[in-house]
Regions:
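Short, acidic/turn-prone active-site loops that include or flank metal/cofactor-
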Residues: 13, 31-39, 88-89, 109-114, ...
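A contiguous loop/helix-start segment that scaffolds small-molecule binding in enzyme catalytic cores
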Residues: 32-34, 48-52, 131-203
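Class I SAM-dependent methyltransferase SAM-binding "motif I" and its flanking Rossmann-like core
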Residues: 25, 66, 70-128
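Short, well-ordered alpha-helical microsegments
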Residues: 15-16, 91-92, 145-146
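Conserved phosphate/pyrophosphate-binding and hydrolysis machinery centered on Walker-type P-loop NTPases
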Residues: 61, 65, 111, 115, ...
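Short hydrophobic/aromatic-enriched beta-strand-loop microsegments
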Residues: 26-35, 82, 102-109, 158-165
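Class I S-adenosyl-L-methionine
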Residues: 2-85
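Hydrophobic side chains in well-ordered alpha-helices
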Residues: 18, 121, 148-149
Length: 203
C-alpha cells in the first residue's frame, strides 16, 4: 500500500488523514484520491493508465458492507487483477471472540430499520440459525445500536445466545456473549460505538 499513488475512498479528507497516520513515504500532495460516489466514471482511470489503485474504507474492512465493493466489481468486470491486503475485519474478529459456531456462519449486513420488518427478519434469522446450526452475523449504524439490541432481546427466544462485540481493537473493546434471558435481566446499553451482533439459536 505504501507504494501506491492512487486511491479510491468514500471520503477524501478522512482517507488523507488515514494515509498520513500510517506514514505514507511520499507527500500527500502527490497522492490522488478519487471519491467513490462522486466520480464513478473516473474510478478505474488509474488502472487503465497502468497504475495500481488502492481502496480505502471509511470504517471497517474495504468492500465488506462497504461502498468499496463497487470498485472491486468494476475492476473484475474490466479484467484487472484484485489483490486483498491483510488487515482486521470486525466481522471475523467478533466471531473469533464470540464462542459461537465458527464452522457455519452467515453475514447478513444491516437489518431492516422498520420495527415490524426488523422483527420479522430477526425471527427469520433465528429460525435459520436453529435449522442450519449456524451463527448469524449483522451490524447496525452506531446510533441505532440500542434500538436493535432492544428488538433482539424482545423478539428472540430466551435460550438463543447473542454476542455483542463493540469497539473491537480499541482499548474500550467489549465482547459479551450470553443467552437472551440474561440480556433481558441485564438491561444493557451499547451506546454509539461500532458494534457487531452475532446470534445463535439453540436446538
Amino acid at each position: 500500500m505504501r507504494s501506491l499513488e492512487h486511491f479510491a475512498a468514500e471520503n477524501a479528507k478522512s482517507a488523507r488523514a488515514f494515509l498520513s497516520a500510517v506514514g505514507m513515504p511520499r507527500p500527500l500532495q502527490q497522492i490522488e484520491i478519487v471519491e467513490i460516489a462522486s466520480a464513478k466514471a473516473e474510478l478505474l482511470k488509474p488502472l487503465r493508465q497502468g497504475h495500481s489503485l488502492g481502496v480505502v474504507s471509511e470504517a471497517g474492512c474495504p468492500a465488506i458492507a462497504d461502498p468499496g465493493a463497487a470498485v472491486i466489481e468494476a475492476a473484475h468486470r474490466e479484467g484487472f487483477r484484485v489483490v486483498p491486503l491483510v488487515g482486521p475485519s470486525s466481522i471475523v474478529l467478533a466471531l473469533m471472540a464470540s464462542g459461537l459456531e465458527g464452522q457455519r456462519f452467515a453475514f447478513c449486513g444491516y437489518l431492516p430499520r422498520g420495527g415490524a420488518e426488523r422483527k420479522k427478519r430477526i425471527g427469520e434469522l433465528e429460525r435459520r440459525s436453529q435449522r442450519e446450526k449456524q451463527t448469524e452475523i449483522f451490524i447496525e449504524t452506531p446510533y441505532r445500536n440500542d434500538v436493535l439490541l432492544a428488538a433482539l432481546v424482545e423478539a428472540c427466544n430466551p435460550g438463543t445466545r447473542l454476542c455483542v462485540a463493540a469497539d473491537l481493537t480499541l482499548p474500550s473493546e467489549s465482547v459479551q456473549t450470553k443467552p437472551i434471558a440474561e440480556w433481558r435481566r441485564a438491561k444493557a446499553a451499547i451506546g454509539r460505538r461500532p458494534a457487531v451482533f452475532l446470534l445463535q439459536a439453540t436446538a
